[in-house]
Amino acid sequence: MLVVVRMCLVSRALALALTAGVLAAAPAHAGQVIVVDGNHAKRVSDADVPTKAQVALPPAGAPSVASAARTGPAAVASRAWRRARSSAKPRADRRAVYNALERAARSKRISQGSYRRWRRWYVNAVRTYRRLRGARRDQLGYVIDSVEALALGHMLSPTRMPAAFVQLERNRRYWPSLPFPAARDQISFKGSEVLYVYFPGEGLQLHPLTTFKKANNMHGACERHEGACDAAGLRRLLDEMETFAVRRSRRFIAWEYGFHFDGGTPPWISGMADATGIQAYGRAADLLGEPHYLEVAREALGAFETLPPLGVRTTGFAGGVHYLQYSFAPRLYIFNAFLQSLIGLHDFGRIADDERATKLFEEAEPEAREEIPLSDVGDWSRYSYRGPEANHDYHELLREFLASMCTRRLGELYCEYADRYRGYQVDPPELTYMGPEVTTAKRLTPIRFEVSKLSAVEAKVYRGEKLVFSRLATFRRGTGAFAWRPRGPGVFTVRLGAKELRTGLGKKDRAATEISVEPAS
């Protein structure tokens, strides 16, 4: 059942006032999406829509990554963006967009109807931009700039036009009066199953990964013969995403991202997103009786044969083939993204009996076997090689992908680490007192212990019933100590407690002992 909160067209001030309360009203057990229908918007809880955590970009605090190249197409894109952002919609920027449309129409690579529609959408977006103020103007301005930057860089090709101009029109409709979304909110528009995500300062952005994850969820509901099966909606989603596929080179199509992220200049692609798309088209081909979906998927395989920044194939840190999360970041090795890329290629190879996809999987899977052990920090997982430890959501995502590799019987190592990482989520900490048993009065004495996982550790020292020492601190996995200076001789009771901080479950362990304190000499 959908949980719905309806919003009517309201003034900007009222919309902003309502945002914090009304848009937060839906439950969190399913993905949340704001559905736009004309001048109305509603937030729904939809089991097919991924949660924010499932499709989020790297966690806050992840190190920035360098762009894959500052020459060639990457440099052209960067210069075009700087020019597009340099002034308030100059005539040269507009002329570049018009010229791109006119060239495509003259060469009959787009229809006259598309030419007129997309030109009108662009003109209307610029007019709307001029009427807006503040943050709403900034969001729409960024999306207009994205179209102009493509045109200025001679990258507004006919295959990029559908996604670019539809995204522009979505933003033009949204920003004048609809409720201001929260960061990373997902938005869809009536009549379309495609998902956009709000990135502050960058407007509503087409998000291939969350859209293709939604497609896989819709397919799963149909395969399980659930009442919620929406085969028509799945067909609409995949048909629309087919029109948004970009001919990134003569060798392959891809689904691009159109915003700046962590040093990357658009348009860039994600191996994880494209592999999920390949998987989605392969799965739906038989269900929907659409064999041409297999050809769409096959056309996307070239990204995994092509080096960055055009494609996502690189050399992993263990020396084998690795598929990148971000085409602009050739040295960022994200464990969960790599596994999902492999799963998508494996599944399509099996479904379509496709030797090329199977070969791409087999070329890179040995690298994954070498990489996964280095994701383990002993009580949790890392997000990326030599990167930060994963937050709870990314640890669970990696565990799920490991379990998926295990159930597909792709290697015992994946089963081992899926079990291990599950243990890290549910096992209590193990706390062991390490000494000393004897010390001397007035001497600074370390109360030593070993703890098995990141925990808040508390030490209390009693003389009889009297508390004489108490300390609390956070310790990582391994050994730790509290410094205690006993004032006089006697027998003291030491009580230690540990509360793990990884899972939010607050699991605990305790240890106790006695220390004999001898008189100072």
Task: Report the location of each language-model feature.
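Low-complexity, Ser/Thr/Pro/Gly-enriched N-terminal "stalk/linker" regions
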Residues: G31-L209, G220, R224-Y257, S375
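Short, compositionally biased P/S/T/A/G/V-rich stretches that sit at domain boundaries
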Residues: G201, G423-L444, A512-S521
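Carbohydrate-binding/catalytic loop surfaces
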Residues: A183-G203, R251-I269, T314-N336, D376-F401
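Short proline/glycine-enriched turn/loop motifs at strand-loop junctions of beta-rich domains
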Residues: V451-A456
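Well-ordered alpha-helical segments within folded domains of soluble proteins
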Residues: G141-A151, P162-V166, Q205-C222, W268-A285, ...
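Glycine-centered tight-turn motifs at strand-turn-strand junctions
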Residues: V468-G490
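Long, well-ordered core segments of solenoidal/helical folds
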Residues: E169-G201, A231-I253, P291-G316, E355-W380, ...
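Conserved aromatic beta-strand anchor motif in extracellular beta-sandwich/beta-rich domains
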Residues: A459-R463
